[in-house]
Amino acid sequence: ERDMTATKGLEGIVATTSAISSIIDGALTYRGINIDELAEHATFEETIYLLWHGKLPNRAELKSLMDELAANAALPDELLTQLRTYPPGANSMAALRSAVSALALYDEEANDMSPEANLRKAVKLQAKLPTIVAAFARIREGKEPIQPKSGVSIAHNFLYMLTGKDPDEVAVKALDKALVLHADHELNASTFAARVTVATLSDIYSGVTSAIGALKGPLHGGANEAVMIMLDEIGSIENVEKYISDKLERKEKIMGFGHRVYKNGDPRAKHLQKMSRELGERAGNLK
C-alpha cells in the first residue's frame, strides 16, 4: 500500500541545493561571504554582481554593471501610460506585479532562454523595478513620474525619482544597506515560486511575476507592510501597551516579531536598528 503521508508547507523537504546564499546556525551568507561584512563594506550594486557571478566585482566590472543598469532604467512610454490607468488606491505590490508582467511585451528577447539573454533580462529587470515603484508612487499622488538619472547608485536614483531632489547621503546609505540585507534569502517562498515557474521553461518575466505575487503575501514580504499598518494604527508611543494587550487578548498576531528560520534573532536586524537610529537622529525623532 502506498504511503500517503504529506509534509505540509514542505518543512524539512530539500527541494534543491544552492550556492547563492545559505543560513547555517543563524548566520546568513551570500556566496560564502557573511552578511555582516557585506552590510558594512559592500554596495548594493557590488552585491548584485556577487549574487549573479559568484564573486565581488573589480572596479571595471562594477562600472560596467552600473552603466548597464543606468542605460536600462527608463520605462517604455506604453508602460507609464498603463501605470496611469491603475486605481490610486491599488496595492503597490499588485501594481509592481502587473507592470513586471507587462514588461515582457516590450522585450524582443523575452522568450530567448539562453544564459546570455537571461542575464541581459536580469539587468533590465533590476534597472526598471525601482523606476516602476517610484513612478507609481508619484502617479497615485497626482504627480508626474521623474526620469532616472545616470551616474548614481540604485538607492540614490530611487530616492531621487520619488522626490525629485537629490537625497541626503545618510538616507542613500540607509536604503543601500537595506537593499544589501534583503538581496537574497535562501529558497524562500518567492524564490521557490519563481523557480517552479521557470522550471516549466517559462520566461524570466513570468518567474519574477510569480515571485512578486508570493512576496506580496502577509506571511512573506507583505509582513513589512503589515508592520507599517500596525504602526499607523498605534499612532503614538502612549498607545503601544494597550494596542498590544488588546491584540494578545484577541489572540491576534503581532507583526514584525519572530522568524520561521531564525530562532535566536535575525542577523540582519542589528544593521537595520543601527540604520533606523541614525535616520531618527537625523530627523530629530527617536521614538
Name each model-derived stretch.
Residues 2-287:
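Hydrophobic alpha-helical bundle cores within soluble ligand-binding/oligomerization subdomains
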